[in-house]
């Protein structure tokens, strides 16, 4: 009898584990992704990397500005009342807009844009990548 119960429990455990292939809807985790601590942590990581890489103040200002602008531009489609910075900043052209019916988690897209721009700016890309992966896992 004990072996039957044990076998049944193993079967149920495997069955439920294999049955959880549900695709997440962006609206389910959008609220969690809008947590400002993710952006603050990303900027703090950028500061740590700049201190480690020893960058001059003019370069540091660009290291902050470009990723933040990238993050803002990725977030603008979710806020129609906000205006894109394209045409207002020297050399910034219009960013391609997503389809109207696209299911996108804009805060996550914003973080992805931030990390992509940040990695392009610094020497210690791996430090930025590790921080990004930690945020994506939460």
State where each predicted segment sits.
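Sec-dependent signal peptide recognition
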Residues: 2-9
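Acidic/polar surface patches and capping/hinge elements
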Residues: 19-138
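C-terminal motif of bacterial Sec signal peptides marking the signal peptidase cleavage site
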Residues: 14-17
């Amino acid at each position: 009898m004990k072996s039957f119960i044990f076998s049944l429990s193993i079967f149920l455990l495997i069955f439920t584990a294999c049955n959880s292939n549900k695709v997440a809807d962006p609206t389910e985790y959008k609220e969690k992704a809008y947590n400002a601590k993710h952006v603050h942590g990303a900027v703090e990581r950028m500061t740590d990397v700049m201190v480690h890489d020893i960058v001059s103040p003019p370069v540091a200002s660009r290291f902050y500005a470009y990723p933040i602008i990238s993050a803002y531009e990725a977030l603008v489609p979710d806020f129609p009342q906000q205006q894109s910075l394209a045409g207002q900043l020297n050399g910034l052209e219009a960013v391609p807009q997503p389809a109207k019916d696209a299911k996108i988690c804009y805060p996550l897209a914003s973080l992805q844009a931030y990390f992509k721009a940040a990695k392009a700016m610094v020497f210690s890309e791996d430090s930025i990548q590790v921080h990004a992966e930690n945020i994506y896992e939460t």
